């Protein structure tokens, strides 16, 4: 069975306050995006890796790869207008049948255990996402103010979100709506249940300068 990692990296670094897109920022001298690809290559050296990047960033990425001697085999697809369209472009390069894991390019600290768990369960469950517990108190905003809700009723969603390849391709044939906030929401729109597995708290999404400091501490 074919395994594919589809890495989506379309950020512009606005929240980071940097001219350099966040996926290219270095952690201990190595770009975030390279560390992310390495995590999946470490899990399965034969895995197909597809990187989705805005066309205007692709030459710079190739220059970075040459500069760092980065030789992990991967294909590049053009980023789209939205994340939905970016993933759809990447899916066009998926080889054959199997399972596809879609992962944020700025989550380099996903554990090998989480990757294995998601891909293993997706073979049986067809649609799997990693989640972690909410540890802070949560309040729901109302017209009159706000109210406390039970944090036990909520989970924080991470990536990779892993699906049967055929199912995922059919899901992405749907018309785009703003309610598609992640891949699970696209698949759920077809009436397909999504199975939850345990993620890892270190699997942070690097989007702010503070996140970069945390990332450096995690090495």
Curated annotation (Swiss-Prot):
Top-level taxon of the source organism: Bacteria
Keyword check for Transferase: yes
EC number, as in UniProt: 2.7.7.60
Site (described: Positions MEP for the nucleophilic attack): 151, 205
Pathway named in the protein's UniProt entry: Isoprenoid biosynthesis; isopentenyl diphosphate biosynthesis via DXP pathway; isopentenyl diphosphate from 1-deoxy-D-xylulose 5-phosphate: step 2/6
Catalysis: reaction(s): 2-C-methyl-D-erythritol 4-phosphate + CTP + H(+) = 4-CDP-2-C-methyl-D-erythritol + diphosphate
Site (Transition state stabilizer): 15, 22
One MF term in the entry's GO annotations: 2-C-methyl-D-erythritol 4-phosphate cytidylyltransferase activity
Stored InterPro entries: IspD (IPR001228), IspD/TarI (IPR034683), IspD/TarI_cytidylyltransf_bact (IPR050088), Nucleotide-diphossugar_trans (IPR029044)
Keyword list, A-Z: Isoprene biosynthesis, Nucleotidyltransferase, Transferase
GO annotation terms (biological process): isopentenyl diphosphate biosynthetic process, methylerythritol 4-phosphate pathway
Function: Catalyzes the formation of 4-diphosphocytidyl-2-C-methyl-D-erythritol from CTP and 2-C-methyl-D-erythritol 4-phosphate (MEP).
Family: Belongs to the IspD/TarI cytidylyltransferase family. IspD subfamily.
NCBIfam families for this protein: ispD, PRK00155.2-3
Protein name as it appears in the record: 2-C-methyl-D-erythritol 4-phosphate cytidylyltransferase
């Amino acid at each position: 069975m074919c395994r594919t990692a589809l890495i989506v990296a379309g950020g512009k670094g606005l929240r980071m306050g940097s001219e350099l897109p966040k996926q290219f920022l270095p952690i201990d001298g190595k770009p975030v995006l390279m560390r992310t690809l390495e995590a999946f290559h470490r899990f399965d050296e034969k895995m197909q890796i597809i990187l989705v990047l805005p066309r205007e960033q692709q030459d710079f990425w190739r220059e970075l790869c040459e500069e760092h001697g980065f030789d992990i085999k991967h294909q590049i697809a053009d980023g789209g207008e939205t994340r939905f369209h970016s993933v759809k472009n990447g899916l066009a390069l998926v080889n054959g049948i199997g399972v596809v894991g879609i992962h944020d390019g700025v989550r380099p600290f996903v554990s090998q255990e989480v990757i294995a768990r998601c891909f293993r369960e997706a073979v049986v469950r067809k649609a799997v996402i990693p989640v972690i517990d909410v540890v802070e108190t949560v309040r729901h905003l109302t017209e009159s103010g706000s109210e406390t809700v039970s944090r036990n009723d909520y989970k924080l969603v991470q990536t990779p979100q892993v699906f049967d390849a055929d199912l995922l391709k059919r899901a992405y044939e749907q018309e785009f709506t703003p309610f598609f906030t992640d891949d699970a929401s696209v698949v759920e729109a077809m009436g397909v249940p999504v199975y939850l597995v345990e993620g890892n708290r270190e699997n942070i999404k690097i989007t702010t300068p503070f996140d970069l400091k945390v990332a450096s501490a995690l090495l």
